[in-house]
Structures are given as C-alpha cells and as structure tokens.
Amino acid sequence: MKTLLLTLVMVTIMCLDLGYTLTCYKGYHDTVVCKPHETICYEYFIPATHGNAILARGCGTSCPGGIRPVCCRTDLSNK
C-alpha cells in the first residue's frame, strides 16, 4: 500500500506544472513552452521578396512590430 501511495505521489509531482508557463505556436505546427518572463504569444509576417511574406510565431515579452502583428496572453492563441 505504501508503494502504491509513493508511486501516485511521484506521478503527481512529475505531471504537475509547479509554475504556470505559457505555450505558444512556433512556426506553422510546432509549439514551444515559453520562459517564465515571456508572457505574450505573437504572430506577424516578415516581408520577403516577390510580394511573399514569412510567418513568425513564438513567445515574447512585448508585442513585436511587423506586418499585421497579433499578440495574446493565453495558451496556443497565436494561430
């Protein structure tokens, strides 16, 4: 019984997020867990050649510039 209880406690500790961390999209499908001081998910376009644009997504401390920036403070909200 003690072994089962110890196992449950260990699993709980390993699965618990002891400090809230933000998760954002990085690129088109990948996600990234932000550092504790990064509180914003962002998405914007970087101008490229021939009228194309490159999508930039990730975590940040402030809303970046760029074309049509979108910034938010909730998990996976920069899609």
Swiss-Prot record:
Where does this protein reside within or beyond the cell? Secreted
- Recorded GO terms, molecular function? acetylcholine receptor inhibitor activity; ion channel regulator activity; toxin activity
Signal is among the record's keywords: yes
This protein's source sits in the domain of life called: Eukaryota
Query: Does Translocase count among this protein's keywords?
Result: no
Keywords recorded for this protein, A-Z:
Acetylcholine receptor inhibiting toxin, Disulfide bond, Ion channel impairing toxin, Neurotoxin, Postsynaptic neurotoxin, Secreted, Signal, Toxin
Q: Which residues form a coiled coil?
A: none
Q: Quote the InterPro entries the UniProt record gives.
A: Snake_3FTx, Snake_toxin-like_sf
UniProt GO cellular component terms: extracellular region
- The main place the protein resides is secreted
- Which residues does UniProt assign to the signal peptide? 1-21
Report the SS bond pairs. 24-41, 34-59, 63-71
Q: In which tissues is it expressed?
A: Expressed by the venom gland.
Q: Which family does it belong to?
A: Belongs to the three-finger toxin family. Short-chain subfamily. Type III alpha-neurotoxin sub-subfamily.
Q: What does this protein do?
A: Binds with high affinity to muscle nicotinic acetylcholine receptor (nAChR) and hinders acetylcholine binding to the receptor, thereby impairing neuromuscular transmission. Causes muscle paralysis, spasms and increased respiration.
What this protein is called in its record is Short neurotoxin 4
